[in-house]
Amino acid sequence: MKMRRGNSSNDHELGILRGANSDTNSDTESIASDRGAFSGPLGRPKRASKKNARFADDLPKRSNSVAGGRGDDDEYVEITLDIRDDSVAVHSVQQAAGGGGHLEDPELALLTKKTLESSLNNTTSLSFFRSTSSRIKNASRELRRVFSRRPSPAVRRFDRTSSAAIHALKGLKFIATKTAAWPAVDQRFDKLSADSNGLLLSAKFWECLGMNKESKDFADQLFRALARRNNVSGDAITKEQLRIFWEQISDESFDAKLQVFFDMVDKDEDGRVTEEEVAEIISLSASANKLSNIQKQAKEYAALIMEELDPDNAGFIMIENLEMLLLQAPNQSVRMGDSRILSQMLSQKLRPAKESNPLVRWSEKIKYFILDNWQRLWIMMLWLGICGGLFTYKFIQYKNKAAYGVMGYCVCVAKGGAETLKFNMALILLPVCRNTITWLRNKTKLGTVVPFDDSLNFHKVIASGIVVGVLLHAGAHLTCDFPRLIAADEDTYEPMEKYFGDQPTSYWWFVKGVEGWTGIVMVVLMAIAFTLATPWFRRNKLNLPNFLKKLTGFNAFWYTHHLFIIVYALLIVHGIKLYLTKIWYQKTTWMYLAVPILLYASERLLRAFRSSIKPVKMIKVAVYPGNVLSLHMTKPQGFKYKSGQFMLVNCRAVSPFEWHPFSITSAPGDDYLSVHIRTLGDWTRKLRTVFSEVCKPPTAGKSGLLRADGGDGNLPFPKVLIDGPYGAPAQDYKKYDVVLLVGLGIGATPMISILKDIINNMKGPDRDSDIENNNSNNNSKGFKTRKAYFYWVTREQGSFEWFKGIMDEISELDEEGIIELHNYCTSVYEEGDARVALIAMLQSLQHAKNGVDVVSGTRVKSHFAKPNWRQVYKKIAVQHPGKRIGVFYCGMPGMIKELKNLALDFSRKTTTKFDFHKENF
């Protein structure tokens, strides 16, 4: 057995334990005084000092002495341990004789790991040295006992890259070879050097490497560092020199990457790194990753690094110090071994199996499609069946009337289309009756068979049915019925005289009639409303001239949709003044529309009445980075809601008529209401402006760019009306023991309310009695959630200020680890890119020392780039086999397809079932 120790008994150590596969082997140990992890005394127990991968290279050469004189034919097991004051963790179990690699039998590896950790952690002694020695001896005996039961696997050569240090290399990868291979760089060189006599200018180095423009400064520093190392002078290089540069920065070995990184920091080439040089590279890395807060505090963070690596205040650090710091592997990686075997099995199972029989493939696809969409399917089949039945009924009815003799099948098609049109014009109002849907969702069990989450989508589907009905009805009349009536001879037209009077002689006769002009006006108004409601116009996705852009957007959608008030009035008139129907009870248009119109009108009146009798008073207003406005207001008496629901907000100072939906970010147990509103359109921009006028820069210790507290006095806050709450998909999270909450940008708002609700339920009896009594039916009753995974993906570092207090509160109160928080900042390059290496190092230092993340400013440690969603699902499936997981997503539609497909894939191929729910906004 060989173990390396630091200079202090408080230091954490990483040892190599070798036990021969024989119980006759004697236990020996030696202590080597290798170079310490830090420059200076290591009297401070700050962090584990991980073993350098280089120290393992000579282990096979010493196997005889370690084994107590055994021959070369013995097989050894190499175990990497992380020994701390009160615990021992196992990094890996490997074959060590003549080569390495993990044990071929994963079950044996896991058994060995559990045996060692149990044995080592149960061994105590008076001194650290004796404790360590006795632990390792005890572990050696346990190891031989385990291995004596099974045959030894084949011996393999030790591979340096399989050691624990390889985990640290993620912070030093410079360019991902899978996306930036040499052929692509070669082609870009030819293009960029065409006008400079075959030389690549340093100013174009970033472009040649395939970096984006934001990394231009970083690439320039990289160019300078490589030029100094290779004795290249000037600001231009040849293709041969570029190839040398490329080989150095794409070298996957640790030493090569570390040397390049050090060269970038050590600009004066004296082999030492000063605090000023560290600050400059921090500022450069922060700029490349759009981390403005870190860039502003570069000097403070440089001082933190120097404090860590230069405890003797020498004023500089050496490459050895930097190397040992970068070798710090996350503690989490040590503890992940328990699920590794199951994870590997799951990976094998998730590999797509190719079915040779096309019939079997199609049958599988159809089966899964039905299972995944049965709620939508039966609703769609019912709707299509009703439309088809109504069309057929009217078609047959008019085929047996006198009008058929003059106009033929045209009148049958027109009347069939009209019947479906009346039905759909009535039905389209129901999906937007929010109060009714919320009541059905909360008070009935219909949610198990009716997909209330798709109400807006069904509203759009019905709109397409209306378009089809208009085309059939108006098209058949204009292109077929009217021309036939005009062109018919006297004998043929005679049966129509009692309906139309004297035979029409032109189109104008039909247009000037009530039926004609009401129909034309309705078609024009519906065409305007439908067009501006499409995503291209409603979300301003089209590149239109500025004067046309003012006629699009949400405001245009909102106001033009109110044209349907005129449309419905004209539709009733149109249905009364029918040419071919004279008996009142056969004029059924008003019968179709009566109940839906009354229901929808009642909801609009209820909104106006409820918002006026339940006024709210502003408590606090804050303006955050990223153009986000936070409104905290009093909660009206009797306003009961569930986390995940939303409410409508109206501000008369902006527009007296517009109501906009926003997710509630406060929890049901809170004595206030809060919403977070991001500036995305005209209305939200004006709202932010009117509230910013009453705000001031925050005092010390408070977040936000601008802030105003209601307790400061009678501030002239603009009057705000609210209406709600209304049901939303996220409110169903309580149905699941385990939930995966995903928020993209401002889409985190409903998830924040859910997290706060979970926190309030964790407090239990400690909650204030008034809050508990006011919301007793919303909290503990029926609360099933026992584990929550929250993934918040945001583009800007400043976004983390929106919910900073909540994140810290969760970190402080969640002692049982019920909530697992993951913040992702996509402006930061992915882990493994050089532009993020120093940020990752700094993040680990700051979090270890102060418990605060340098990116988010909270106690929650942030991740870089975008999440690997497949790995997220895989992790949850491994940790919760046989469970049903609720997946709730809120954000832009770009991620919906990936998250939904992964939920379906894992549900089909594992015992863990994922139910995907998305928020519509």
Curated annotation (Swiss-Prot):
Start and end residues of each Ferric oxidoreductase domain: 415-572
Subcellular location: Membrane
Segments in the Extracellular topological domain: 398-461, 538-559, 607-734
Pfam families xrefs: FAD_binding_8 (PF08022), Ferric_reduct (PF01794), NAD_binding_6 (PF08030), NADPH_Ox (PF08414)
Region (EF-hand-like 1): 193-203
Sequence ranges of Basic residues compositional bias: 44-53
Signal peptide as annotated in the record: none
SUPFAM superfamilies: EF-hand, Ferredoxin reductase-like, C-terminal NADP-linked domain, Riboflavin synthase domain-like
Protein family per UniProt: Belongs to the RBOH (TC 5.B.1.3) family.
UniProt-recorded name of the protein: Respiratory burst oxidase homolog protein D
Organism: Arabidopsis thaliana (Mouse-ear cress)
